[in-house]
Amino acid sequence: MANPHGDRYPPEAFPDADDLPPRVRRGRGNARLEAFIQIDGKPIGSITPARGDVWAQRAARRSFDLELWQADDVSNHVEMKAAVILVEGRGTHAQVILNHAPCGSEKYDPAGCDDYLPDFIPIGRSMTVLGTDARGNPFRRTYEGKAVR
């Protein structure tokens, strides 16, 4: 399915995908990255990858606490922030709908959220990310937590 910008998303990303900015395209002047978050089916609101907000700080702290040193580099990313919201809110499942795909999920990408999320999310909890990839195709992936805390 496509939103008003013509960006394609998985069907379960709607109606939120209709309200996202145009998809982020690497190497170009871009629209801002934005994500809508749900925890256990309850809408939480939208977040951006701002570096200085409280969720980025908490994600950096969690990376440190879990000794995921490389994950600190992406602590401002919306997926990492959503994972912190999930953990601190004692939820079991987060859904993130964003106008991109997680870093690290595309062929030839360096390590990123796609690699770190399973070790960042606690055992028994999960996150589904719905977005649109670099080629404009729908993206859907569920990350099952492996962290012991």
Where are these regions (language model features)?
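Short HxH-centered metal-ligating active-site micro-motif
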Residues: A59-P102
